[in-house]
């Protein structure tokens, strides 16, 4: 009986922590999803200003650039294959990876709207990523 009482006490200690972690993970997943469409819209508007059409591979290139920064040089597809993941890779990313990706997507929107080209944005996003990760390490 004491064993079950101790288990119940431990559960009451752990449950709020786990619940908070799950809420943070869900928030990160929703946030990263909410920035993707505006990023694509910003890219399309930027390319239209340049008189260029935007095709599917342009969106893929942007997504792959950000994924490579977050996932250690791999695209989301490569990362999923390397980790034996089926389905949507973002559904299997850690909360930290999702928060990192959403930060970069949000930053990329701003850089696109400022008229920066792909290579300039990529360099700036790598720099911003390093700063973001350094701040996270300090927490």
Regions found by a protein language model. Name each.
Residues 1-139:
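Positively charged, phosphate-engaging catalytic surfaces used for nucleic-acid and nucleotide handling
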């Amino acid at each position: 009986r004491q064993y079950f009482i101790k288990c119940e006490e431990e559960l009451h200690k752990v449950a709020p922590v786990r619940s908070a972690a799950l809420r943070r993970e869900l928030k990160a997943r929703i946030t990263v999803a909410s920035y993707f469409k505006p990023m694509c819209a910003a890219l399309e508007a930027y390319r239209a200003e340049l008189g260029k059409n935007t095709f599917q591979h342009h969106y893929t290139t942007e997504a792959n650039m950000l994924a490579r920064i977050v996932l250690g040089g791999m695209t989301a597809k490569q990362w999923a294959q390397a980790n034996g993941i089926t389905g949507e890779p973002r559904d299997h990313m850690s909360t930290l990876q999702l928060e990192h990706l959403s930060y970069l997507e949000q930053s990329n929107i701003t850089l696109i709207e400022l008229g920066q080209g792909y290579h300039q944005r990529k360099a700036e996003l790598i720099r911003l990523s390093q700063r973001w990760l350094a701040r996270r390490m300090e927490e």
